[in-house]
């Protein structure tokens, strides 16, 4: 990764001034100092990304299996008639394990062999630089994945071959977020990894992007609508209810994080909208025909 702030471009006084005026400098120094050999390793990004996955899955697996009757979680559950069991999770975790063995760990090995160590900049990114870049990455992925997702549903052979794997679950939970066909996993992982290459990106911004992208992807799959959820504050953010609807009615709510494209194209729908439909419309709205889904595996 490029050193965005080469030391030779600064005088000693300028370097000290920059270090003293950058809000994120103390955070960057705390993260970096003493950990350079770990953070600079080409193995750090893939295993850091995996640690985010494992943390989300571990936390919500515990909630789903042991705290599902606690009133706070019971009230927040979106599809209250669906219970997440260990048998359901095992099927998803098994596929994730195979995907990691086939794709993630071999790619990590390739990085170890071919990718040089990361040069850790002395200076932290500015707040404006970090926030503006994260916003661009977020918008770019959300827009691009909408179309990838849309065509995966509209092109029937592509849906049957690839994306139907993710739709084995009609009631999602955190562990099902990575229940993906290897092709889809490859596309998503590659895009999340490479979108920061749009322009030179500080490694701290790069790592935070990984955290944001993966966390939002898990948040929309958790199956809970918490009172503090972002979609309750920002109308243009989809959140768990919209993606839950997508798993229940797969021809609706295609956009992964925002919803402006779904709204523009008429695919955004809520559970309240379903309740207002006539019985005839309710039975078919947003669903594939029986013929289209013939032979596809459904787990829940």
Curated annotation (Swiss-Prot):
Locate the motif Histidine box-3: 242-248
Q: How does it sit in the membrane?
A: Multi-pass membrane protein
Membrane-spanning parts? 43-63, 95-115, 130-152, 180-200
GO BP terms, alphabetized: sterol biosynthetic process
| Position of sequence motif Histidine box-1 | 148-152
Q: Name one GO cellular component term.
A: endoplasmic reticulum membrane
Q: Which domain of life is it from?
A: Eukaryota
- The motif Histidine box-2: which residues? 163-167
Which Gene Ontology MF annotations are present? C-4 methylsterol oxidase activity; iron ion binding
Return the Pfam families for the record: FA_hydroxylase
Q: What is this protein called?
A: Cholesterol 25-hydroxylase-like protein
Q: What does this protein do?
A: Probable sterol desaturase.
Class of the enzyme per the UniProt entry, highest EC level? oxidoreductase
Q: Does Membrane count among this protein's keywords?
A: yes
Instruction: Please state every residue range assigned to the domain named Fatty acid hydroxylase.
Output: 135-266
Query: Where in or outside the cell?
Result: Membrane
Q: Which UniProt keywords apply?
A: Glycoprotein, Iron, Lipid biosynthesis, Lipid metabolism, Membrane, Metal-binding, Oxidoreductase, Steroid biosynthesis, Steroid metabolism, Sterol biosynthesis, Sterol metabolism, Transmembrane, Transmembrane helix
InterPro entries the record matches: Fatty_acid_hydroxylase, Sterol_Desaturase_Related
> What PANTHER family does the entry give?
STEROL DESATURASE
Provide the E.C. number(s) assigned to this enzyme: 1.14.99.-
> Is Membrane there in the keyword field?
yes
Provide the primary localization. membrane
